[in-house]
């Protein structure tokens, strides 16, 4: 039971606090993504990101 609780907590942390290398776990808006990445002199693209068993759109700067 404790292992299940730890896995659930880690899943929630990864799902809601992802902000690594230009990726966020919030729904992606293509124009806002491009604008945000333009500040870093990079191109922005909305990608489908899979976290465990769920999927979400996120912004990726490259």
Curated annotation (Swiss-Prot):
Signal peptide: 1-22
Annotated positions for site Basic residue of the functional dyad: 45
Cystine pairs: 28-46, 33-59, 37-61
Subcellular locations according to the entry: Secreted
Domain of life: Eukaryota
Keywords annotated in UniProt: Disulfide bond, Ion channel impairing toxin, Neurotoxin, Potassium channel impairing toxin, Secreted, Signal, Toxin
Site-annotated residues for Aromatic residue of the functional dyad: 62
Entry's free-text remark on domains: Has the structural arrangement of an alpha-helix connected to antiparallel beta-sheets by disulfide bonds (CS-alpha/beta).
Its biological purpose: May block potassium channels.
Name this protein carries in UniProt: U10-hottentoxin-Hj2a
């Amino acid at each position: 039971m404790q292992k299940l609780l730890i896995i659930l907590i880690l899943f929630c942390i990864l799902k809601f606090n992802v902000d690594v290398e230009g990726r966020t776990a919030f729904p992606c808006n293509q124009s806002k993504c491009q604008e945000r990445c333009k500040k870093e002199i990079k191109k922005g693209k909305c990608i489908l990101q899979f976290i465990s068993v769920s999927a979400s759109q996120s912004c990726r700067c490259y």
